[in-house]
Amino acid sequence: MTKSYSESGLMGEPQPQGPPSWTDECLSSQDEDHEADKKEDELEAMNAEEDSLRNGGDEEDEDEDLEEEDEEEEEDDQKPKRRGPKKKKMTKARLERFKLRRMKANARERNRMHGLNAALDNLRKVVPCYSKTQKLSKIETLRLAKNYIWALSEILRSGKSPDLVSFVQTLCKGLSQPTTNLVAGCLQLNPRTFLPEQNPDMPPHLPTASASFPVHPYSYQSPGLPSPPYGTMDSSHVFQVKPPPHAYSATLEPFFESPLTDCTSPSFDGPLSPPLSINGNFSFKHEPSAEFEKNYAFTMHYPAATLAGPQSHGSIFSGATAPRCEIPIDNIMSFDSHSHHERVMSAQLNAIFHD
């Protein structure tokens, strides 16, 4: 039995090898490319090492800086983020610049405050509120200056000089009680004559300017020692005195009967009430008695020889050379109830002003 050609070829005879296929060629070309890339990488690494040796430690420093920045960024990421610009490190130069800027700013602020205080002092000399012992605050000075400008503008607009009471009411609008008393004392006017019926500065239980007070029948002649305007308890009494020389005397001259002239010691005319205090120096003494009454005594710092009182009260001033004397008020005036007496004394204390 014979075998076919195909079977014999498949089974026993080896096939002849042909030329290399295209796949083998591709694999060999890829190997050559890899070898060339490796050589190029080695050359680049050698060149980089040579450059690093030439440049010294510059790259190392840069790497360290980059590492530090990376560490700081990591720390910042861990900490809560702050709003606004980042804080720079405070070097000596920056610290000196900061101190210099702070010193310049302090000097500018100091000069500004000095100029403001000087301007306010000049304004205090112009406004009608003169006092040797008290100094107006900044806000009170500005308020009084505003009222003074408004009052003068009203006079110029109307062309008529208003009465003294309305002029002082315009000046004292919105001012505190001490400043009102100073203005009234400067214009020689009783503060009770222009206070409104319900003054917000005064407590409601105190009597107003329209209230009637008992006036004692005794009158003291003291030409050398003035009695304060609140001692007379008369709301219509205006002292005919000459105010101290000042810059605003010419403006206020139409409000007085006689022209204002410079004088050192003002003269008081007419019968005055007994002096209750001088410059607001009070000395109260509490002496309990069987009727639970209080005896108040006023201490005055002037010789008793200068007081010329009626003969019926000659026993009050004992000793011509004694520098201090006490006047019991219970011997001069009496009140029906203790509460009314306290209200009168509180009203007198509220009306104190210093000349």
UniProtKB/Swiss-Prot annotation:
User: Which residue ranges does the record assign to the bHLH domain?
Assistant: 100-152
List where in the cell it is found: Cytoplasm; Nucleus
Q: Which GO terms describe its cellular component?
A: cytoplasm; RNA polymerase II transcription regulator complex
What residue spans carry the Acidic residues bias annotation? 58-77
- What tissues harbor this protein? Most abundant in pancreatic alpha- and beta-cells, less in brain and intestine.
Q: Give the start-end ranges of region Disordered.
A: 1-93
What residue spans carry the Basic residues bias annotation? 80-92
- What one GO molecular function would you report for this record? E-box binding
Q: What InterPro entries is this protein classified in?
A: bHLH_dom, bHLH_transcription_factors, HLH_DNA-bd_sf, NeuroD_DUF, TF_bHLH_NeuroD
Intrachain S-S bonds:
none
Q: Which PROSITE patterns match?
A: BHLH
Entry's Pfam families? HLH (PF00010), Neuro_bHLH (PF12533)
- UniProt modification remark: Phosphorylated. In islet cells, phosphorylated on Ser-273 upon glucose stimulation; which may be required for nuclear localization. In activated neurons, phosphorylated on Ser-334; which promotes dendritic growth. Phosphorylated by MAPK1; phosphorylation regulates heterodimerization and DNA-binding activities. Phosphorylation on Ser-265 and Ser-273 increases transactivation on the insulin promoter in glucose-stimulated insulinoma cells.
Q: Name one GO biological process term.
A: axon development
Report the residues modified as Phosphoserine: S161, S258, S265, S273, S334
Motif Nuclear localization signal per UniProt: ranges = 86-92
Q: Which CDD domains match?
A: bHLH_TS_NeuroD1
Keywords from UniProt, A to Z, are: Activator, Cytoplasm, Developmental protein, Differentiation, DNA-binding, Neurogenesis, Nucleus, Phosphoprotein, Transcription, Transcription regulation
Job description of the protein: Acts as a transcriptional activator: mediates transcriptional activation by binding to E box-containing promoter consensus core sequences 5'-CANNTG-3'. Associates with the p300/CBP transcription coactivator complex to stimulate transcription of the secretin gene as well as the gene encoding the cyclin-dependent kinase inhibitor CDKN1A.
Assembly and oligomerization: Efficient DNA-binding requires dimerization with another bHLH protein. Heterodimer with TCF3/E47; the heterodimer is inhibited in presence of ID2, but not NR0B2, to E-box element. Interacts with EP300; the interaction is inhibited by NR0B2. Interacts with RREB1. Interacts with ATOH8.
| Protein name per Swiss-Prot or TrEMBL | Neurogenic differentiation factor 1
Species of origin:
Mesocricetus auratus (Golden hamster)
